[in-house]
Amino acid sequence: MAKTAIAYKEKMKELSMLSLICSCFYPEPRNIAAYTFDDMEVKQLNKRASGQAFELILKPPSPVSEAPRTLASPKRKDVSLEEIQAKLEAAEERRKSQEAQILKQLAEKREHEREVLQKALEENNNFSRMAEEKLVLKMEQIKENREYYLASLMERLKEKERHAADVRKNKEQLELSG
């Protein structure tokens, strides 16, 4: 009895809910292992947990089917010498036009490169001139500061010399009077 219950449980797991409901209405099992379409038949070979396998059977072509049609290439019309010459001239004009367009694009590109180079040189010159002006101003400022510093040192030195002279003079007067 336990084996029957286990087998029933396994069968219930395999069946979908729709199959379960349908099995209540139709007690005999349906063969859902084969499906038929217009020109083929699909048979289910086996069903496993890892996947399913199918066999695809193509029906032979019916005798009424049409034979494959071969498409006839359109007839070539005779081309005159004038038409060939006109086509060649048009092709030559197209080629010349393309060459002229390419040359024009190259000239524009060269002109743009020249403008970019000129602008870079101009910016470089401006930068150099500005840097030189800044350097000259800085050097002038340093020179002025140095002159001011030296002048202040000389002034202090003169002040010390005057003070030393006053001290000597006072000392001499003390020695003479004393």
Swiss-Prot record:
Its main location: cytoplasm. One of its GO terms (biological process) is regulation of microtubule polymerization or depolymerization. GO terms for cellular component: cytoplasm; growth cone; lamellipodium; membrane; neuron projection; neuronal cell body. PANTHER family: STATHMIN, STATHMIN-2. It is a peripheral membrane protein. The keyword Membrane applies. PROSITE patterns: STATHMIN_1 (PS00563), STATHMIN_2 (PS01041), STATHMIN_3 (PS51663). Residues 75-178 form a coiled coil. InterPro entries: Stathmin_CS (IPR030514), Stathmin_fam (IPR000956), Stathmin_sf (IPR036002). Keywords: Cell projection, Coiled coil, Cytoplasm, Membrane, Phosphoprotein. The gene is stmn2-b. This is Stathmin-2-B. It holds the Pfam family Stathmin. One of its GO terms (molecular function) is tubulin binding. Disulfide bonds: none annotated. Nervous tissue. Belongs to the stathmin family. It is found in: Cytoplasm; Membrane; Cell projection, Lamellipodium. Residues 38-178 form the SLD domain.
